[in-house]
Amino acid sequence: MTAQSPAPDLYPPVQQEIARLAALAEVRSAFAWFRAHESRLAEYQMEVARIAAPPFGEAARGAWLAGRFRESGLSDVDVDQAGNVFAVHPGYGSRYVALSAHIDTVFPAATPLNIRQQGTKLYGPGISDNGAGIVAMLAIAHALQAAHIPHALPFVFIGNVGEEGEGDLRGMRHVFATPRWNQAIAYSVVVDGAGSDTVVAEALGSRRFEMIVRGPGGHSWSDFGSPNPIIVLARAIDAFSRTPVPVLPKTTFNVGVIRGGTSVNSIPESASMRVDLRSTSMAEIDRLEGALRVALERAVKLENEAASLHTTRKPQAIQSEVVEIGNRPAGELATDARVFKVIRAVDAHLGNAAQVQRASTDANIPLSLGREAVAIGGGGSGGGAHTLQEWFDCNGRDLGLKRILLTMLALAGSGE
């Protein structure tokens, strides 16, 4: 699937349904609510951004969100064992349309959070990713309650943990691994960051490893010839970097972190590196993982053999360990999936130009399971994600919120 996927005019029945929904007095009232309460939404966004939520440290932010869900009038507010926060807007069916946004950030707990507003712009770490997504959920919840919009399938709102970095999508994994929600969620709409110009309908797969090498260590002069963990990693990187990768399916690898050693005249006792493998094909990721493991095994063997030639005493052998620190499955939404038709028809109705993209988001989990899911932005615009200079511009937020609301209502079906 690409940005040149079938045009929305191939889905006239869906477009007609979107036009009907948008003309309802209740929906127009919800649209008006978005505009009238922008200042309140901006306050919510700054409030949540001031609560640190590093990976595996989201509890305080989760408690805040549970309180806001209750305040909005949603029912069945709950926090599961993983820390995911749930709330329900009732309907008439047994299956749900899920609206989710991750509540974690990439920033450590001690990061200075200088959250502030200048005009229509909000500034500070996490203000857009994923302050914008969290506030979009709250806006939809409040507007549904205020406008009394009927819909058939109920909505479940999920503030999930563990999307960023080493969180490895743990929150969404837990949602789809639990009997309560595994089969109950019919459609998933993930709100991640700012903007209204993308539709993530293709999940980028990735696998990450930490490779650790340990040896006896020693002095660079008196223990010369003892096996060196850093040299092992250098050999492994050199060999692995020669692994061919295809242009299609697009496949990449990266050695992003190397650690080891204490001084220039010390043979290190240990060294490690972190490697990131990505592809649109899980088979290619499997192939790269195999090549990476072979490269390390051969490098260890070569260094142990070399060490035995440089000393008269039997050297202590190098040992290696490979630890998987991330595994995000790939997946792709079919172009005839209802959620894809709906979001494209919504964009056509709103005159919104959005491109279909591939990315790594919480939608990876349902997509990898063959479920219908997309990830979209919460409106407005943003930049500087994952930096202290992150920003969000509230201008255009209402377009993103209209987009989310119409998509949710169309997926849920009429409650009339």
Language-model-detected regions and their locations in the chain:
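Metal-dependent amide/peptide-bond hydrolase catalytic core
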Residues: 2-29, 46, 221-222, 229-416
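Short glycine/proline-enriched loop/turn "hinge" motifs that connect secondary-structure elements
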Residues: 107, 149-150, 200-206, 264-269, ...
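Glycine/charged-rich beta-loop-alpha catalytic/anionic-binding loops adjacent to active sites
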Residues: 113-126, 214-217, 385-386
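Acidic/histidine-rich catalytic neighborhood of metal-dependent amide-processing enzymes
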Residues: 126, 130-204, 246, 412, ...
